[in-house]
C-alpha cells in the first residue's frame, strides 16, 4: 500500500504484511533475548570497579540493523516517507546501593546519542547520585526522535550511560541499576518539550514495619532495655507471630509477666522521603 501522508502510526503507513514483518523483527525470541543480554532491559546492572563506565544501547545492534533495513526498503520503493526513527518517551532507572552508607562514592547517569562521538548528555539531562542518597529513581526524556542510521561503524540510537566515581577500596559491586523503557519506531518524527532529568529520592524499605503486633523478640528486648527483671520464660502452646525478617515464623513463647508491662506500638510516624525534582 502506498504511503498516503496522513497517517501517524507505522501500522497505518504500511500494509498489514509489512507491519507483521516489523513485529517479527521486534518480538522474535532472538530479539527479546538480545534486549536482555545486550541492553539490560528490566535487568539489574551491577556497577563494579572493573566496569566503572557502562554504555548500554536501547536497541540491540542486530535488531537495529534489521529495523533500519525494513524502513529503507519501504522508503526506496516509495511506501514510507523516511528511513525510520526511534522514539523513546521516557527512560526510568531504579538505583540502589549495595554497600554501607559510609562508602564515599557516587554515580553519574545520563542519556546519550551513540551518533555523538563524545557521548555527551542529551540536552544536559544528567543526574549525579551520592552513595548516601540511594535508593533513588531517575528519569530521562529525549527531546527528539533518533534516526535509524549508521554513523561510521556505530548504529545510531539512544543509550544509557552510567559512570562510577570514588568508592576507594571497593572493588566489587557498589550499586545496582535497573533500567526500563519502551522504544517505538516510526517513519515520522517530532521534537518534544525540554524537561530536566528527574531525580526522586526514595525512602529505604522498612521491613520491620510490616509487623501487625509486637513480636516475642521485640518484647524481650524492651524488657531488657527498661532494666526490668523478668522471670524465666517457659515454652507453652501460645503461638506468637515472629516476623523479624521477611519470612514469618511461628514461635511458641509464653507471654511476659504483667510486671513487665505492655509493649507500646505507638511511634512517631516515619518521615516521608524528600522528593527533589520529582518524576
UniProtKB/Swiss-Prot annotation:
Question: What is this protein identified as?
Answer: Movement protein
Q: Supply one GO CC term from the record.
A: host cell plasmodesma
Q: What does this protein do?
A: Transports viral genome to neighboring plant cells directly through plasmosdesmata, without any budding. The movement protein allows efficient cell to cell propagation, by bypassing the host cell wall barrier. Acts by forming a tubular structure at the host plasmodesmata, enlarging it enough to allow free passage of virion capsids.
Q: Which organism is it from?
A: Cucumber mosaic virus (strain M)
What compartments host this protein? Host cell junction, Host plasmodesma
Database matches in InterPro entries = MPV (IPR000603)
BP GO annotations: transport of virus in host, cell to cell
Q: Which UniProt keywords apply?
A: Host cell junction, Transport, Viral movement protein
The yes or no answer to whether the keyword Repeat is present is no
One matching Pfam family: 3A
Cleaved signal peptide residues = none
Q: Which family is annotated?
A: Belongs to the cucumovirus movement protein family.
Q: Respond yes or no to whether keyword Lipid biosynthesis is given for this record.
A: no
Amino acid at each position: 500500500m502506498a504511503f498516503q501522508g496522513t497517517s501517524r502510526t507505522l501500522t497505518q503507513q504500511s500494509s498489514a504484511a509489512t507491519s507483521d514483518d516489523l513485529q517479527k523483527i521486534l518480538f522474535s525470541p532472538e530479539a527479546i533475548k538480545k534486549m536482555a543480554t545486550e541492553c539490560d532491559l528490566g535487568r539489574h546492572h551491577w556497577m563494579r570497579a572493573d566496569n566503572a563506565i557502562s554504555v548500554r544501547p536501547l536497541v540491540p545492534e542486530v535488531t537495529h540493523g534489521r529495523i533500519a533495513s525494513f524502513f529503507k526498503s519501504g522508503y526506496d520503493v516509495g511506501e514510507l516517507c523516511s528511513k525510520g526513527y526511534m522514539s523513546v518517551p521516557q527512560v526510568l532507572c531504579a538505583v540502589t546501593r549495595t554497600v554501607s552508607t559510609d562508602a564515599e562514592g557516587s554515580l553519574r547517569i545520563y542519556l546519550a546519542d551513540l551518533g555523538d562521538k563524545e557521548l555527551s548528555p542529551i540536552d544536559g539531562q544528567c543526574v549525579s547520585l551520592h552513595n548516601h542518597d540511594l535508593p533513588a529513581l531517575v528519569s530521562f526524556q529525549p527531546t527528539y526522535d533518533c534516526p535509524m542510521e549508521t554513523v561510521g561503524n556505530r548504529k545510531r540510537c539512544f543509550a544509557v550511560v552510567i559512570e562510577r566515581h570514588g568508592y576507594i577500596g571497593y572493588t566489587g559491586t557498589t550499586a545496582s541499576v535497573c533500567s526500563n523503557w519502551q522504544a517505538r519506531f516510526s517513519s515520522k518524527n517530532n521534537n518534544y518539550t525540554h524537561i530536566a532529568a528527574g531525580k526522586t529520592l526514595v525512602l529505604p524499605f522498612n521491613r520491620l514495619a510490616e509487623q501487625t503486633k509486637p513480636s516475642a523478640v521485640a518484647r524481650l528486648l524492651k524488657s531488657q532495655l527498661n532494666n526490668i527483671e523478668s522471670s524465666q520464660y517457659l515454652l507453652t502452646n501460645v503461638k506468637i507471630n515472629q516476623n523479624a525478617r521477611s519470612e514469618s515464623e511461628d514461635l511458641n513463647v509464653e507471654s511476659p509477666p504483667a510486671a513487665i508491662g505492655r509493649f507500646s506500638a505507638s511511634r512517631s510516624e516515619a518521615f516521608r522521603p524528600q522528593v527533589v525534582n520529582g518524576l
